[in-house]
Amino acid sequence: MFLGTHSPRLDEKGRLILPAKFRDELGNGLVFTRGQERCIYVFSQREFERVHEQMRDAPISSRQARDYIRVFLSGASDEMPDKQGRVTIPAALRAYAGLDRELAVIGAGSRAEIWGATAWAEYLEEKENAFSDTDDNDIPGIL
């Protein structure tokens, strides 16, 4: 499970050093893809295969499903971290998420997410008030 917030930096080659707590889960390969809110989703190979299986069950007659699958999978890139836990984030995904040197890598349960540090701080500031006001009627089954 991916938990917490980490603040690594991109090096000049577009590489990220994976947070130590995430390396066991991602050390045998990972998949980057476009995330919602202009972040990058990071899945273990196993979890990505599970997500892909769910997508395969979507009706091909659904335009919304086709559109989502195309955007999601066309941006996907499978990568292998090196022995130091570094992994290159493809340039197209760095551009999509507007990444510069300072990052926020957050745990989101079954996946990690990579955000630009400023974008993450802005998102968190915007959403924290709504978070504190959320009750069990707003999100059934979670609280």
UniProtKB/Swiss-Prot annotation:
Keywords: Cytoplasm, DNA-binding, Repeat, Transcription, Transcription regulation. Gene3D superfamilies: Transcriptional regulator MraZ domain. Its main location: cytoplasm. It is found in: Cytoplasm, Nucleoid. One of its GO terms (molecular function) is DNA-binding transcription factor activity. One of its GO terms (biological process) is negative regulation of DNA-templated transcription initiation. It comes from the Bacteria. Residues 5-47, 76-119 form the SpoVT-AbrB domain. SUPFAM superfamilies: AbrB/MazE/MraZ-like. One of its GO terms (cellular component) is nucleoid. Signal peptide: none annotated. It holds the Pfam family MraZ. Belongs to the MraZ family. NCBIfam families: division/cell wall cluster transcriptional repressor MraZ. HAMAP family: MraZ. Forms oligomers. This is Transcriptional regulator MraZ. It comes from Renibacterium salmoninarum (strain ATCC 33209 / DSM 20767 / JCM 11484 / NBRC 15589 / NCIMB 2235). The gene is mraZ.
